[in-house]
């Protein structure tokens, strides 16, 4: 669970910015987007193959 504590003199905007950055670093947003719709096993396999080719 991602958690950000707001300091006494810290604005809500800066705390929200830190929270969003932390979510991005933890990969939570990418995970949510990936699970937004059902992905067939064959599509998942094809996506992983494409990613591995992209890395090389």
Swiss-Prot record:
One of its GO terms (molecular function) is structural constituent of ribosome. The keyword Ribosomal protein applies. It comes from the Bacteria. Coiled coil: none annotated. GO terms for biological process: translation. Keywords: Ribonucleoprotein, Ribosomal protein. One of its GO terms (cellular component) is ribonucleoprotein complex. InterPro entries: Ribosomal_bS21, Ribosomal_bS21_sf. Pfam families: Ribosomal_S21. Belongs to the bacterial ribosomal protein bS21 family. PANTHER family: MITOCHONDRIAL 28S RIBOSOMAL PROTEIN S21, SMALL RIBOSOMAL SUBUNIT PROTEIN BS21. HAMAP family: Ribosomal_bS21. This is Small ribosomal subunit protein bS21. It comes from Dictyoglomus turgidum (strain DSM 6724 / Z-1310). The lineage of its organism: Bacteria, Pseudomonadati, Dictyoglomota, Dictyoglomia, Dictyoglomales.
């Amino acid at each position: 669970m991602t958690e950000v504590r707001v300091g006494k003199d810290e604005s809500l905007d800066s705390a929200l910015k830190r929270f969003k950055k932390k979510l991005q670093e933890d990969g939570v947003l990418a995970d949510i987007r990936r699970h937004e719709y059902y992905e067939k096993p064959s599509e998942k396999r094809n996506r992983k193959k494409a990613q591995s080719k992209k890395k090389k």
